[in-house]
Structures are given as C-alpha cells and as structure tokens.
Amino acid sequence: MSSTQFDGDIDSFVSYLKSNRGLSANTLKAYRADLTACLHLFELRGVTDLNEITLDDLRSWMAVESRDHARSSMARKTVAVRGFFAWAYEHGLTTTDPAATLMTPSIPSTLPAVLTESQAEQLLDVAEHAVATNQYKDDGGAAAAPGSGKAAGKTADKSADTVNRSEAPARADKRDNARVTAESQRNAAILELLYATGIRVAELVSMDIADIDFSNRTIKVTGKGNKQRVVPFGLPAQRALETWLEQGRPVLARTATDAVKSRAANALFLGARGGRIDQRIARDIVHRAAREAGVPDISPHALRHSAATHMLDGGADLREVQEMLGHSSLKTTQRYTHVSIEQLKNRYGQAFPRA
C-alpha cells in the first residue's frame, strides 16, 4: 500500500472510528486502504493540503475509480471518503467539507445466486464422504519399536541405521495421511456450519472454540460493528464440529510453531500450518467443494444466501431470518423472499398443468 503525507490524518480518523463507531477490523482495514489510495492520487496531482481538495476533485476521483471497481466497492469507497472529510471538518483540519454532497453510487438490487436444497445436500454429502474415504487413525507420529524382526540379530548400530532409514518415510506418510484426514474433517465442519447458520466467512474465521455451545447447539457470532448474536445449528453440523475438534484439530495444531500455536490457541478453525484459518482458505474450501460435488460454483456468501432462502422456503419468519443473518435492516433480508418467489415460479412452471 502506498504511503502519503496524509497517513497521520488517516490513522487518526481510523482510530476515531474504532473508538466511536465499533466497526469491524475488516471494515477499518478497507476504509484505510480506500482513503490511502484516494489521497495518494491527489498527492500525485500536487495536492499538499486537504483544503485544496474540492468536490469536483472528488467526483473526478470517483470517475477514475469506477473504471476498475464494481458499484458496491465504489459505494464503500465513497462512504469512507465522505466520512473522512466530515471528520476532518469537525476537527478543524479543513475549513469546508468538500464531500458533504458527494453522492453514493446506487447499487442495483440483484437476486443473489443460491443452490437448490438438493444441490446443498449434495455439496455436504460429498464433503462428508471425503472424510470417510480419507479416514486415517492418527497415532501421534509414534514410531515402531526398534530391534525387532530381522534387525534383532544385528549390531545396535546397524539396527538403528536400518530403523532410521526405513521408518522415517513411514512416519512421514503417517503424518501426511493424518493431515489429509484432518483437513477433510475441517472442511466438512466449515461447510456444515456455513450452511447451517448462514454466517459470513469473516465471522466464521474469527470464531473461537468457546463460541460454541454444544449443550444448546448454538454459536455466538460477532458480526459487523462488533454486534453479537446467538445462532442455532443442527445435528449434522454438531457431528462435523465434534469430529473436527476431537480428531482433526489436534493434528493441525501439532504442525504449528510455538508462536503460531500461542496466537491460535483459541481458534475454532486452523490452517495447514496450525494458525487461525484465513478468509482466502475458507473461500477456496467452498469453491473446491462445489467443483467436487458437481454443483454450480459458489462462494461462502452464496452459501449464506442459500441457507436464508431455504429457511424461508421452509416456513421461517422473515424477522427470524433477519436475526439469524445479523442484518440491521429487514429490507436486506427481504431480498431472499424475491429468490423464493423466483423458485416458486420455476416450480409452478414445471409442475402446474396450466402453467
């Protein structure tokens, strides 16, 4: 990320948001990147003072940025810039607020892509099958006792040499097999939990083990703006989580260095090196699972859409789904009723004789 002479002002603004708005770390990171890129562009144009930036300058910046970014991204960038200049004006850094009338680009209301219920079931079945076919009983990497079989009658040196050369690859194979099994168990648990709860991928990767309440079959989720909610999950997700925590997680945890292990000690899901899993890996797990299951390619967010739509199809109340998804506005949740209507039209056309 390019640095600018305005980095100090950006830092102060982000600190203000963190203290007063309760925005998530991901949102703050995105705002910081948006502001740095915007002000770096003005710096390249010779701007040395925030007071030199006008509304026309900001509109010109938006025109440049909109060539390479979707409207949803531009909407976020505009909110960040408008918020920054409002803060700068309130704190006496500028004599005017040039962004006060800067318009946020309208975002077209598109129907989210979703899997059918049978496709979702197929996705989860394939993940469960992968656990079964990759099943490997991990023994913690213990080696067989030396000095047995043909090596017993030879000298200690020869015996040790034989064991070292023959058993080292075997131990490596055991570790590799155990890791593959552990990752399959983790992937199945991730897919089950995403679909069962409709949580966001950012919420998933930030979860700790303590956030799961198996007795009530619920999870505590920290969403946007650090707002917390409690979401229920079903028996298939419980089984997948228990298998991962009891069998798979200890295997991946052993691969971590002491420093990584300390940072990820409470993390629910781990990566291949034993650290807390990141969003990129979680997204890749979902995309890869969709390919292997032969269903339409989806993202974790599309799996969230699918969960919401299937709940509404099953008779759930709209406000219940709103609470589950952590939407601040009911209008956001209402998008999923449109999807259900489209599915109803398709079913009607296929099943009704006078369609």
Swiss-Prot record:
Sequence ranges assigned to domain Tyr recombinase in this UniProt record: 158-349
Short name of any one Pfam family annotated for the protein: Phage_integrase
GO molecular function, one term: DNA binding
Low complexity bias locations: 141-154
Active site: R200, K224, H301, R304, H327, Y336
GO CC field: cytoplasm
GO BP term, pick one: chromosome segregation
Major location category of this protein: cytoplasm
Compartment list: Cytoplasm
Composition skew (Basic and acidic residues), residue ranges: 168-178
Keywords assigned by UniProt, alphabetized: Cell cycle, Cell division, Chromosome partition, Cytoplasm, DNA integration, DNA recombination, DNA-binding
Occurrences of domain Core-binding (CB) (ranges): 4-89
CDD domains membership: INT_XerDC_C
Record region (Disordered): 137-181
InterPro entries recorded: CB, DNA_brk_join_enz, Integrase-like_cat_sf, Integrase_catalytic, Integrase_recombinase_N, Integrase_SAM-like_N, Tyrosine_recombinase_XerC/XerD, Tyrosine_recombinase_XerCD
Primary role: Site-specific tyrosine recombinase, which acts by catalyzing the cutting and rejoining of the recombining DNA molecules. The XerC-XerD complex is essential to convert dimers of the bacterial chromosome into monomers to permit their segregation at cell division. It also contributes to the segregational stability of plasmids.
Assigned protein family: Belongs to the 'phage' integrase family. XerC subfamily.
Quaternary organization: Forms a cyclic heterotetrameric complex composed of two molecules of XerC and two molecules of XerD.
This protein's name: Tyrosine recombinase XerC
Lineage, uppermost ranks: Bacteria, Bacillati, Actinomycetota, Actinomycetes, Bifidobacteriales
Gene: xerC
